[in-house]
């Protein structure tokens, strides 16, 4: 069983798509016990590979979702900033009219509230943008950690199997 496990671990370590078993093991594969050990390792290889791929795919989909949010926030920010420029321009014109008595003070106050609301919305969008960027960074880190954990686990198992194989020889 150790040779079959060693073949799986070597394939995992090298990132191969299938296991290349030791020639001695292939030669003895007519033996039902050895054949079963090889099949077990192939199944384990496929399961572990599929699980890793699934985890990384899930993380990538989350990253894409956050990137979509970033694009949406960018568009909303552009619209809000444009709106704020127009309101400020209108407010600037209105202030002169209010001073001269041609427009109501209430209209000026309403416009100032609109400026405050737009500024607040821009601040919220900027905060959301920062959170989405941070989330993308964390997700990328999680993907790297998942791959490193997998490699570390394979290397640890490789070292154990190598010791056991040497002990048997």
What are these regions (language model features)?
Residues 1-14:
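Hydrophobic or amphipathic alpha-helical targeting/insertion segments
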Residues 13-39:
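Amphipathic alpha-helical blocks and their helix-capping loop/short-beta junctions
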Residues 31, 35-169:
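Long, charged amphipathic alpha-helices with heptad-repeat/coiled-coil character
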